[in-house]
From Swiss-Prot:
It catalyses: Endohydrolysis of (1->4)-beta-D-glucosidic linkages in cellulose, lichenin and cereal beta-D-glucans. Residues 1-25 form the signal peptide. This is Endoglucanase Z. Domain B' repeats lie at residues 744-831. It comes from Thermoclostridium stercorarium. The active site is at D84, H400, D438, E447. The gene is celZ. Keywords: Carbohydrate metabolism, Cellulose degradation, Glycosidase, Hydrolase, Polysaccharide degradation, Repeat, Signal. Pfam families: CBM_3, CBM_X2, Glyco_hydro_9. Coiled coil: none annotated. Domain B repeats lie at residues 651-738.
Length: 986
């Protein structure tokens, strides 16, 4: 990908030496590789249109295939917006641009993680659609679907039946905001495809140029009306004109677009009663001037853009001009109730991008990187729960999402669980006090959206770039089918000595994927032996209907005449039955089977289909496998009686099965055949016949598909065709899953001292869980067995000679197993020979100087005034105070230039209370904090409170100071290796 920077900036950076940034020392905290791949996978579940054959799930299907038909165009494709099914092109185009920005800024990380291909697929899925929406230079279709109609129905995308009108803007009815955002999206797509598919990139550029011109010559949103109340443009269109101009410059190198981008800066919003560019909101679908500002800073190096973006990032991190965005007690930078995590994680992405730019100072880079990690870790679980579906501890299980819920009843309460896991979806997030309810009705905190994940993906890519992680091999969403998709529930309406009347409801509760069926039928089987023995025949039996919701009821039809078995055929062909509401997912029919009048030999007890419904009366019904269901003549539910004739079709007892590759759960799959007079020629996978005796066995009417054969497949959906000598060939669909427990190691962190007097081999115990260790790797390169490490049973020894060759810092070793997620060993490498006790100076102030407060906020600045480095893990700082009412207490590090995750806080109750002190807070540092170099300073901003938020009285505390900026305080004590080096103890 091409990146453009001004010549002046490059020269300046070369002169100042700012190209080198210190590596980040914090611990990884979470598996960013897994989080990244899942966040990208989410977009596959949002796809509209004809889905590709290589899709990685079994619960999404084709949908929205008539989009655009009302205007004579093909407007299929794109993404559904959130938990609904409208295609709003403003947030969609924004989201695609953000994904392209991630590809632009974190290309190496995405390639290394194996996720670039999936990300490019997501980008192109939208850019292809946006091109369709632009049929001529000054016409753009900006929305498909009516938000009000769409929101009035709750069901899966595959079966929606409402009108889906297409809405456009043109010269007479313009929409500069959405058109310019589409231009940005296509220009950004051109940037990432420039070297991969130049022809496609050229197509994107052509459309982007035309769209930009269209937006620029109209400069109006008067025609952008259909999204009103859903995605209004509050910030206007000038921010989009700058944003799109920047991306067109990056795509083309044409400075005309860069000049245009800068020209529109004067029209960006400002803070009230000032001329300062707005900095207190966040980059989002509505306001993209923050991203434009950041890119302009990187491209031009101009101070106006640097100051503006730093003002914004400061406001979100350490505060600007005495103000900071609200922080929840557990550390989320919280802007707004609707999608709070969307704003925090997107700002985290911007912070990471800017921090990694050479024009950002070391001090600012440390602040912004620390902020970014804190916010991403919050989303992944640092508050005690994950906010990403399918990831981490206690993730959301009930997101506000129609297709993932997969209701058949047009109801958020049916079923009372989600049938599908919406892997990777970032939910809206908590309230300003960390409160959150995982409830399907909670669309404020628990809905998901394409724009929620957009900045999140980029931020995760930057986390993976810095801290690594282990993507799950062959991640997929092939789920086990957990309920019957088609079935009949039946009962007895009435019965007499010569008749029975059946009430039957044919159900479609399909979900893997949901689908509209208009060729469903079922059969009710009867035994006419008693009638025939009385001298009658099947032709003497009459079939009538009482209530009928669209079926053609015929019969009796012969099934096995030798055994007097016949059936009533109830055929709903032409009637749509689909999981879309009470009247849609089930159709009722009431039919009567009657022998001649005045006869009394009718016997229900010997009828095949009567088995489960005997005694089921008074309008009640039960599900029964003895009333089999067919889709276009193919058995999809139930069991047929033996000896069938008619169409001479064979059947199998199950048509769906699940095979688990987990060695502890692998089982053969047994299928019972109803041959119906046919013979089994063989079983086919595609056009290839399985090998009898090797892949499967046959014993009588039972076929056993062997686990050795099934285990040869990767996780996927496999269809096995039972090839019979006559009739239709039934298909067994096997969902191949893998719940194998990944291997683990003990420990996952270790220390190594390069000092020869202290160095030791690092020993690791393997917990294979049935997996096999293939290699130990560092940065993708395998260590040499026997030279770098050894294996003895389940113990791996990393040789000290290998570790002694590694630099001081953090080394990450990946244990590469044949299955599951690979565990990682992090080794903190130090060299005690380099460490001598240094001279340290501490300055502090209180972030809160109120007499009474529920939160004490000591801020420290440590400076090494000596000539040798100080290992920070040897340093302890004590702040003395009175607790004023014994309670549990909580500690937070709001920010530190060495990373808040590298700061520890311990509350110590003093054995002998002193005046002004019965407790102290001891602040320490982890190994990841590294060293404090001579003449270097670091900052630590702490905060602590009682668990019940009752007040402290600060004025009588030993260490309390009224300083509001850094100054001396000899009542703060500092220790190095347990030795007091600064301050006076009480």
């Amino acid at each position: 990908m091409r990146k453009f920077y001004s010549f002046a900036i490059i020269i300046s950076l070369l002169v100042t030496g700012l190209f080198i940034h210190t590596p980040k020392a914090e611990a990884a905290g979470y598996n960013y590789g897994e989080a990244l791949q899942k966040a990208i996978m989410f977009y596959e579940f949002q796809r509209s249109g004809k889905l590709p054959e290589n899709k990685r799930d079994n619960w999404r299907g084709d949908s929205g295939l008539n989009d655009g038909a009302d205007v004579g165009l093909d407007l299929t494709g794109g993404w559904y917006d959130a938990g609904d099914h409208v295609k709003f092109n403003l947030p969609m185009a924004y989201s695609q641009t953000m994904l392209a920005w991630a590809a632009y800024e974190a290309e190496e990380a995405l390639e290394r993680s194996g996720q670039m291909g999936y990300l490019l697929d997501a980008i192109k899925w939208v850019s292809d659609y946006l091109i369709k929406c632009h049929p001529s230079p000054n016409v753009f279709y900006y929305q498909v679907g009516d938000g009000h109609l769409d929101h009035s129905w709750w069901g899966p995308a595959e079966v929606m039946q409402m009108d889906r009108p297409a809405y456009k803007v043109d010269l007479a009815n313009p929409g500069s905001t959405v058109v310019a955002e589409a231009a940005a999206a296509l220009a950004s797509a051109a940037v990432v495809f420039a070297d991969r598919d130049p022809a496609y990139a050229a197509t994107c550029i052509q459309h982007a140029k035309e769209l930009y011109n269209f937006a620029e010559i109209t400069k109006s949103d008067s025609g952008y009306t259909a999204a009103s109340g859903f995605y209004d443009s509050h910030s206007g269109f000038y921010d989009e004109l700058s944003w799109a101009g920047v991306w067109l410059y990056l795509a083309t190198g044409d400075e005309t677009y860069l000049n245009k981008a800068e020209q529109y800066v004067a029209y960006w919003g400002t803070e009230p009663q000032t001329n300062i560019i707005s900095y207190k909101w966040a980059h989002c679908w509505d306001d993209v001037h923050y991203g434009a500002c950041l890119l302009l800073a990187k491209i031009t190096g101009k101070q106006i853009y640097k100051e503006a973006i730093e003002r914004h990032l400061d406001y979100w991190s350490v505060g600007y001009n005495g103000e900071r965005v609200h922080y929840t007690p557990k550390g989320l930078a919280w802007l707004d109730s609707w999608g709070s995590l969307r704003y925090a994680t997107t700002t985290a992405f911007l912070a990471s991008v800017y921090a990694d730019w050479e024009g950002c100072s070391r001090e600012k880079a440390a602040i912004y990187n620390d902020f970014a990690k804190q916010q991403i870790d919050y989303a992944l679980g640092s508050s005690g729960r994950s906010y990403v579906v399918g990831f981490g501890v206690n993730p959301p299980k009930r997101p506000h999402h129609r297709t993932a819920h997969s209701s058949w009843a047009d109801s958020m309460s049916v079923p009372d669980y989600h049938r599908h896991v919406l892997i990777g979806a970032l939910v809206g997030g908590p309230g300003k006090d960390d409160s959150y309810t995982d409830d399907i009705n909670n669309y404020i905190n628990n809905e998901v959206a394409c724009d929620y994940n957009a900045g999140f993906v980029g931020a995760l890519a930057k986390m993976y770039e810095d801290y690594g992680g282990s993507p799950i091999p062959d991640l997929n969403a092939f789920e086990e089918i957990t309920n019957d998709e088609f079935f009949v529930m039946a009962g007895i309406n009435a019965s007499g000595q010569n008749f029975i009347e059946i009430k039957a409801l044919l159900h479609n509760q399909s979900g893997w994927p949901a689908r509209v069926a208009d060729k469903l039928s079922f059969r009710y089987f009867v035994d006419l032996t008693e009638l025939i023995e009385a001298g009658y025949s099947a032709s003497d039996v009459t079939i009538t209907t009482n209530y009928n919701a669209g079926a053609k009821v015929t019969g009796l039809h012969p099934w096995n005449e030798a055994e007097n078995i016949y059936y009533v055929n109830v055929d709903f062909t032409g009637t749509k039955i689909y999981p879309g509401g009470q009247s849609a997912y089930r159709k009722e029919v009431q039919f009567r089977i009657a022998a001649p009048q005045n006869t009394n030999f009718w016997n229900n007890d010997n009828d095949y289909s009567f088995r489960d419904i005997k005694g089921v009366t008074s309008g009640n019904t039960v599900k029964t496998v003895y009333i089999p269901v067919y889709d276009d003549g193919v058995l999809v539910f139930g069991v047929e009686p033996e000896g069938g004739s008619g169409e001479n079709n064979s059947s199998i007892s199950i048509t769906n099965a699940t095979f688990d590759k987990n060695p502890a759960k692998q089982e053969n799959i047994q299928v019972v055949m109803n041959l119906n007079g046919n013979t089994l020629n063989g079983i086919k996978y595609g056009n290839t016949y399985l090998r009898e005796g090797t892949d499967y066995t046959v014993s009588g009417d039972t076929v056993t598909i062997l686990k050795s054969f099934l285990n040869s497949f990767d996780t996927s959906t496999v269809q096995l065709i039972f090839d019979f000598s006559a009739g239709r060939d039934p298909v067994l669909t096997v969902n191949i899953i893998d719940t194998t427990t990944s291997a683990s190691i003990v420990p996952t962190t270790a220390d190594f001292d390069k000092n020869p007097d202290a160095s030791r081999d690092v020993k690791v115990k393997l917990v294979p869980n049935g997996n096999t260790l293939l290699a130990v790797k560092k940065d993708g390169e395998a260590l040499v067995l026997g030279r770098d490490y050894s294996i003895d049973g389940d113990e791996v020894t990393i040789f000290r000679e290998y570790l002694a060759d590694q630099p001081v810092g953090r080394v990450t070793l990946t244990f590469d197993f044949d299955r599951g997620t690979d565990p990682v060993l992090t080794i903190n490498i130090t060299d005690s020979r380099q460490v001598e006790t240094g001279v340290i100076q501490i300055q502090m102030f209180n972030g809160n100087t109120s007499d009474k407060t529920n939160g004490i906020m000591p801020r420290y600045r440590l400076t090494n005034t000596g000539t040798t480095p100080i290992r920070l893990s040897d340093v302890k700082i004590r702040y003395y105070y009175t607790i004023d009412g014994e309670k549990d207490q909580n500690f937070w590090c709001d920010w530190s230039s060495v990373g808040s995750n590298n700061i520890t806080g311990t509350f110590v109750k003093m054995a002998e209370p002193k005046e002004g002190a019965d407790y102290y807070l001891e602040t320490g540092f982890t190994d990841g904090a590294g060293y404090l170099q001579p003449n270097q300073s670091i900052e630590v901003q702490n905060r602590f409170s009682k668990a019940d938020w009752t007040d402290y009285i600060q004025t009588n505390d030993y260490s309390f100071s009224t300083n509001t900026s850094y100054g001396s305080n000899d009542r703060i004590t500092v220790y190095i290796s347990g030795v007091l080096v600064s301050g006076i103890e009480p």
